[in-house]
Amino acid sequence: MIRISFLPFLCSALLLTQTGASGKEMPSPYPAPEPGVRLTPPESPAPVLNEPRLFGARPGSPIQFAICASGERPMSFAAAKLPPGVKLNRETGVITGKISRPGTYSFPVQISNGHGKTNGTITIRIGQEMCLTPPMGWSSWYSYSGGVSQENILKTARLLVSSGLAQYGYRYVNIDDCWQGARGGKYRAIQPNKRFPDMKSMCREIHSLGLKAGIYSTPWMGTYAGYMGGTSPNPQGDYSSLALPENKRPQPDQLFGGCPGSQRLGAAKIGPVWMVTQDARQWAEWGFDYVKMDWYLIDVPSTERIAADLKKSGRDIVLSVSNSTPFEIAGPISKTANVWRTTGDIEDHWGSLKKIASSQEKWQPYAGPGHWNDPDMLQIGRLGKVGKANTTFKPTRLTPDEQYFQMSFWAMISAPLIISCDLEPVSYTHLRAHETRRH
């Protein structure tokens, strides 16, 4: 059973910005924006231990698990009977190290500050399952989208911490489409474009904040946004036979143009040469913890092959597959992927929310520790235009009630909670809405 309490931070945060949307199927024009509302109670200054309290890793894999606790800083973390091979940073609450022996390790923790203390239990499970709780974090797709860069990824990572969202479990910082450059390096893997000068140092900084890093790809030859994918027309990784001339590309590395360029040019399919294997090695070497693999139709053999490549990469990397998983393969997909999209792309209007929410019941038997249904990202806060290099953002078109509905429903069905808004202009007060606790 899941008990949900909306704490002070995320939904009222993004809800207190002005919003305008309709409860109907996209009428035009929309009604005048409604004033923001706040339904969540104020945050306690005393320590509160939030979810997740359960973490999974494979034997011998690097562990980085942040104890999520809200309350006034500075705060002190203590743990008794830590399993051999890991240590706790008493100031940040981040547990790091490696555990070689399979098993379940539970240990008590105490968190204290000037207003009091709280106690709880953390469990680390070492085996073949990871992602034992639904992922929570942020993705670039509905905000920076085609303008995603190392600079705005690191800015968002710092804002997740400084805003307090990380204290409620929002720990993944995920790069979506549009980061890709050409193939190269020792693995002949996809290298980043010029907006990402140093992936390894970026991941290192994200980890230093107690967060985790995510990346995006596809088993197609081209992504939805027209960038290089995980398969190739030839062993050399040369896509020139399919690509647009450079002077016709929206961005230099956008080989196939904007969506639906990959479909139009024949790149929206799995190519004859599989290169995900070397891409996975590169992601692991850079330090990524999560990958979204995006294609249609999702199929079991490709998913199994991707999962095997990630497992061989030498790093625990969560596998999220997108989009529109056929329900007929829910069983085998739920045994292979950690996260799978149950829908197409969500939009910030009631018609989209209603359609998605109404279709989720049949998926529920397939969700559980390590494997989660994904009805797509939260449409809360200030959003950009998908696929565009956004530098300005507009408030979501969802009404405050619709935003609270999405937060509540997604939490009740144990869905991933991935926000995708621009966090920079969101004030401390505005961040009161995404702080959802699951028990």
Q: At which residue positions do the language-model features occur?
A:
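Aromatic-lined carbohydrate-binding/catalytic grooves of carbohydrate-active enzymes
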Residues: 156, 160-290, 295, 300
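Conserved small/polar residues in nucleotide/adenosyl-binding loops
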Residues: 429-439
